[in-house]
Amino acid sequence: MQSSLRIFSGILALSLSGSLYALPECPSGPSEKWHNCFGTFSIDGDKYFGEYKEGKQHGQGTYTRADGEKYVGEFKEDKMHGQGTYTRADGEKYVGEWKEDKMHGQGTYTRADGGKYVGEFNENKMHGQGTYTFADGKKYFGELKEGKNHGQGTYTFADGRKYVGEWKEGLYHGQGTYSFADGRVFRGHYMNNQYVPSICQDMGLTKGTEAFGQCVLKLIDEITKDN
């Protein structure tokens, strides 16, 4: 029985190592000459273990930085490229697609405080369609541009409040509906996070007057041109 277990363990170890790297081990000598093999390279406390092609990190590999940060995944010509996982020293983690050392494509970024973004990235920034769930319970689902809520989106607060509508550079801007937990609803146009009728009232104009109506129409026109 013990003999059978030893044989099984040996087969398992061989199959695992074979599944990790199908290429042969790189020969001794400068890494610039390594080709179609896997090897280990260290410099200034950083360490790479993985596949090489024409002297460059290319294929599957693991790169561990001296500060403890680590990338495990695909490489292309010495750059993180393809599917991979990057774990920061503070615990933050990105799992998803990479392009030339940048988060690019579909991915999931988890912050150290528990906040999480799942969606599209463009050159290291949240960009496209995505969902961001905050550690305190708030949630945004919709379009983003260069890391900010931009376009159509829904923002839900932990206390039940909700905004559904247009955004611009992280602010309510355009057509939208703001619902309160007590049932009140402000539906209409927003400008830089403010409800348009409220802006006119703050200017001292009385709701229902001609001046108030002109103020509202003017701001809506500005918003329309701005978008």
What are the residue ranges of the model-derived segments?
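Bacterial N-terminal signal peptides
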Residues: 9-17
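Glycine/tyrosine- and acidic-biased, solvent-exposed loop/turn segments at the edges of beta-strands
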Residues: 20-227
